[in-house]
Amino acid sequence: MNKKSYINHYLTLFKVTTLLFTLSSNPVWANIKTVQGTTSGFPLLTRTFTFNGNLQWNVSALQPAYIVSSQARDNLDTVHIQSSEINAPTNSLAPFNNWINTKSAVELGYSFAGITCTSNPCPTMKLPLLFHPDLTNLTPPGKKNSDGGEIFKLHNESNLGVSFQIGVKTNTSLDWVNAKNNFSSLKVLMVPFNSSDKISLHLRAKFHLLTDFSSLNNDITIDPMNTSIGKINLETWRGSTGNFSVKYVGEDKGDISIFFNTPKIILKKQQRRCTLNNAPVSPNPVKLRAVKKRELEAQSEMEGGTFQLRVNCDNTTYNKANGKWLFPVVKVTFTDEDGTTNNGTNDLLRTQTGSGQATGVSLRIKRENGTETVKYGADSAQMGNAGQFELRKQPSPAGGDQYAEETFKVYYVKDSTRGTLIEGKVKAAATFTMSYQ
């Protein structure tokens, strides 16, 4: 070989080597387990397809932190705990035990390229995908989530539990399977011979409170943890052709270790609430303009005045955590003080009777949109109280907007059940009860 041809040959090898290096560093395939095939035995052949090596799978929650709040003051539902994600949309509240999606730096799974068969017909390779929970870090307290999956107590954290689902994605579908507290099969993979199919693995989690908020002395911050939750591997499969001339083996000589980087979690004990300022109703008393008897007889209903109801929700002790506002939903119930039926369906406010008082008239309060009427209910902050409704404007974290309010209009209403329409003074009294949910 002359010098020139040697140099050309060397340069060609250099280019090939560089290309191979680039392919091997591709992050998409870095954690895909591939198969190696070997043939042994004669005259009865055994074709063995082996997945070698151990992999580590690191997953992290898509949200870096979750704030978990006890119920607002008047929320009697002790099960439906609410949470808010840092950097989530304004006032974003969702059940704490919704599924939390995760992310991984690389795709992880199994490739079946190289699993070949020259027999006719070929057997169907069935590889059970197994999950082994790491019970040194996860303690099953004997509870299940709403999907029937096991809830595990995190190591050294008695207040918090977690449940998992492993996602197995094929070319056509993504199936989620609950992780159990013992060795279990996630799914039996039907592996076709002579194909380039692969599966990728995914993980999602739910958090669960294992304690009642009333047992907490203070707010609790649970810092992020890198927790081993278990391992995944394939169970060995053996099969043969119809005449047993060739045996086939599929095996996994390693496993995939799963590590979950949990988000920061804040358990907010203080109950969310708002407060009334010195003048929650403005003006108070509400002064109505005078109307004439003939006008009301002609129209049956006439506007008499307006008032505004406002409550402040800017107390950071109750409504703020980790720099994020967590407001309750502010609702109100109006209750009549002068004999109106407070059953949540009646919308007429009875006026006072006596010397000099008008008769044949009641009052109706309409909400800010001018069409919905206030219906009177019992003096109670209980959730779902008859007549209870949500104030039109709810508190917002923007600027100094941490309050709830609504403007109401008061109407004179001709009411024959109150007697003949006679001019006089019109007085009525109603109270309101706030409910923070």
Curated annotation (Swiss-Prot):
A Pfam family recorded for this sequence: Fimbrial
Main localisation: other
Keyword Cell membrane: no
Signal peptide (residue range): 1-30
Biological processes, Gene Ontology terms: cell adhesion involved in single-species biofilm formation
TM stretches of this protein: none
Keyword set, alphabetical order: Fimbrium, Signal
InterPro entries for the chain: Adhesion_dom_fimbrial, Adhesion_dom_fimbrial_sf, Adhesion_dom_sf, Bact_Fimbrial_Adh_Pro
Gene Ontology CC: one annotated term: pilus
Residue ranges the record marks as coiled coil: none
The UniProt record lists the keyword Nucleotide-binding: no
Subcellular location: Fimbrium
SUPFAM superfamilies given in the database record: Bacterial adhesins (SSF49401)
Homology family: Belongs to the fimbrial protein family.
Function: May be a minor structural protein required for pilus biogenesis. May be the adhesive component in the pili.
Protein name listed in UniProt: Minor fimbrial subunit HifE
Gene giving rise to this polypeptide: hifE
